[in-house]
Regions:
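N-terminal intrinsically disordered/low-complexity leader segments
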Residues: 1-10, 193-195
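Solvent-exposed, amphipathic alpha-helical segments
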Residues: 14, 18-25, 72-75, 159-166
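Helix-turn-helix
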Residues: 14, 22-56, 60
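Hydrophobic alpha-helical connector segments
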Residues: 60, 74-105, 153-156
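Short, basic, alpha-helical segments at the C-terminal edge of helix-turn-helix-like DNA-binding modules
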Residues: 63-68
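Amphipathic alpha-helical segments used for helix-helix packing
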Residues: 84-88, 100-127
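Hydrophobic/aromatic-rich alpha-helical bundle segments in the mid-to-C-terminal region
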Residues: 119-128, 141-195
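Active-site oxyanion/phosphate-handling segment shared across diverse enzymes
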Residues: 130-140
């Protein structure tokens, strides 16, 4: 019996979600398609009914994960007082929880160096996600002069991604926690200086 278009779309969505988690946890090159499909509750043989290649799956998983991340961060600060929004965003992203759970975190922090070596379309999707995160941060930089918000927000997102990436190198080390704390403090102090 053939699946309906709705069922096929739901299955594809499950594969993309499983792939995003698998890539973030194990790296793109280490994530076998058989493991991705098993994580989605499917057999390896069904992969090519949904995707032309692993590259196509990487592109879609990166896009979907970044869109979900930005949406969840927007929801996190929705209806919060302006002065609490930026610290809340920074604390949430640059955290032990994010460091310790790469499967559910930002693909830029989990896969940055691998994404840099992917095809042009995938790099474009990754940069669009970076820019969306930057725009979200910029929207909460009311103490920074308007003309400097874009560049400041890009620097902040770069620091956030870098901190989580570095903290994951030695997650059981006191240095790991220090990197997270120092980066959070530095970002918030640097923004407050521009009042």
């Amino acid at each position: 019996m053939r699946k309906s278009k709705v069922e096929t779309a739901k299955t594809r969505e499950r594969i993309v979600k499983a792939a995003g988690a698998e890539f973030a946890a194990n790296g793109i090159s280490e994530a076998a398609l058989a493991r991705v499909m098993a994580s989605a509750g499917l057999t390896h043989g069904g992969f090519y009914r949904h995707f032309v290649s692993k590259d196509q799956l990487v592109l879609e998983a990166c896009s979907k994960t970044l869109l979900s991340l930005v949406a969840s961060l927007e929801l996190l600060v929705n209806r919060k007082p302006r002065e609490q929004a930026l610290p809340l965003l920074v604390d949430h992203y640059v955290s032990r929880a994010h460091r310790d759970q790469p499967r559910t975190g930002c693909p830029l922090a989990a896969l940055g160096s691998e994404l840099a070596r992917r095809d042009k379309r995938t790099r474009h999707v990754a940069m669009q996600g970076f820019l969306q995160l930057s725009r979200l941060i910029a929207s909460h930089l009311e103490t920074v002069p308007f003309r400097k918000r874009a560049e400041r927000s890009m620097a902040i997102v770069s620091a956030m991604v870098g901190a989580v990436t570095l903290a994951r190198i030695a997650p059981d080390s006191p240095i790991s926690d220090s990197v997270l704390v120092a980066t959070r403090d530095y970002i918030i102090r640097s923004v407050r200086r521009h009042r």
